Amino acid sequence: MSEEKDRVDGTADETKAETKSSDHHTEDTYEKVCFMCRRPESKAGKMITLPGNINICPDCMQKSFDTMNQNPGQINEMMNNMNNMPNIGMFDLSGLSNQIPNRQRVKKKEEKKKTKEFSIKDIPPPHRIKAMLDEYVIGQERAKKVMSVAVYNHYKRVFAPQDGNIEIEKSNMLMIGPTGSGKTYLVQTLARLLDVPLAITDATSLTEAGYIGDDIESVVSKLLAAADNDVERAEHGIIFIDEIDKIAKKKNTNQRDVSGEAVQQGMLKLLEGSDIEVPVGANSKNAMVPLETVNTRNILFICGGAFPDLTDIIKERLNKTASIGFQADLKDKYDGDKNLLSQVTLEDLRTFGMVSEFLGRLPIVFTLESLNEDMLVEILKEPKNAILKQYKRLLELDEVKLEFDDDALRSIARKALEKDTGARALRSIIEDFMLDIMYEIPKDSSIGEVIITKDYIEKTGGPTILLRGQEVPKLEQK
């Protein structure tokens, strides 16, 4: 009898242990989900558990408190009139447990493997950085060289042993180039090749703290999110602020410039290096969201813009240096110079409306060339992830070969130049012409090859479509 009792007790203990182990495994495998917004704990932050095992995220809890605090009179009035409203009852939390959907927890995403410790020996030299950029970016030779050296020096500064006597300044950059010349693409490619987190923001959305719009510190919050909330990784990342020319100082205005000069002034400490408190898993600071401190001292800032009126300022400066008798000739010469931006000076940028202190924190200034027809044709064909290679691969999956005539590529490049939006026009043009082809091909398994011709691009004919094993055109677009 005693042995049997011991056996039963042992079985019970084992069951308890298994249950405990199972619960522990569940906790490790699953995460809580907010009852109101349905975001998991990894996205919304640590959950607040209410009676009945109801999980609420900090954001939703804060919004509930804010709503109650805004209209206390209305809530009191409703409470006083409860007896006169027989069909309405108070919200009972205890009854919620029966209404909660089963899916209150979701599986945790597998944790990413920790990246290798980065050291000064791992920093690729400038010629290797440029060689990697060459595989993806066509042209812009000087811009790629300047960026390669600046990035190399920046990360040397970050990972080199500290020398108390010499402090190396940050290599923040200002790139100036026409729309569609590849500013954003260059930065994206650079960050991907170096495997560092990247945050891209638009300067037009930034305003001085306290005004409607994104405050200046929000750019650091985006970088922290890009680094999966890993502060150390974020502190070695890159922030790209596009359309920086849009925050130039406004001229002849008596109103406070909250989205121009004030934003430039507000960014000074950020560019130089300071401790910034940013919310984790939320877009704005509030009492219920945990904050992380991010130091921007080792974050590389790259600003870019088209600066559309800057060429007029450069022309005016160059003409002032010429004698009166030659001014007309020089003006005509500069009017035809598509790469006039390459002669920009800091004085020109100050005249444009950029604050001197702001420019002082962007020591490396360089320009990008305007894209010509030859460069656009190269962009279509040559990079590792060229647009044509992507479409060829898509048709390969349908076992169809895709080719483009050289004249067709020239015609596409000319159409892109007419749109005056640079390389970004190429994809939309090709997508437009490929739509019908990609729609029709899966219908007919006998099609073996499609050749895009100049006539098709210029809408005077159709593509050449060949049957499998045949050399004779099958269909022409009407």
Locate each region found by the language model.
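Non-catalytic accessory segments flanking P-loop/AAA+ NTPase cores
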Residues: 1-240, 245-478
